Amino acid sequence: MHGCNCNRVSGHLSAVRSSGLENGPFGPSGFGPSMWFTMHSGAAERAIRGGYLTENEKAAWESWLRNLWVCIPCESCRRHYMGIVNAVDFGSVNTGDKVFRLTVDIHNMVNARLNKPHVTLQKAICIYGLDTKLGPASTITFRANTSTFN
């Protein structure tokens, strides 16, 4: 991975009631950002550790990525994701860097379908802290109001 020349990436996080989201909480804007953050952060952490994946890690990453569709609440998104992942040659995904690159490639295929911007690998490296080896500069935290369950 190459060093970053993007002067750190900044972001903005806002809270929106799920009823205000396009297609509600189960549409792409409801579940997508958190799911992508989880996927990319895990892959970034493995890339930062460096080296080759163990056979167990390879199997676990393949299984997790292949089966993530079960967590996607949007039916058309789920089908599209399954189509993307079914076409992946996991045999060549043998390092953390390659896992990270794969997650960026998958995300960009989804972005293309949704007419969203393509994110370069270099920008993703900056966003998820592979350039500094410190991980993402920001995190997403969610705390549910559980008093409604009492």
UniProtKB/Swiss-Prot annotation:
UniProt EC number: 1.8.3.2
Keywords: Disulfide bond, FAD, Flavoprotein, Oxidoreductase
Needed co-factor(s): FAD
Disulfide-bond pairs as recorded: 74-77
Catalytic reactions on record: 2 R'C(R)SH + O2 = R'C(R)S-S(R)CR' + H2O2
GO molecular function annotation: thiol oxidase activity
Name listed for the protein in its UniProt record: Putative FAD-linked sulfhydryl oxidase 088R
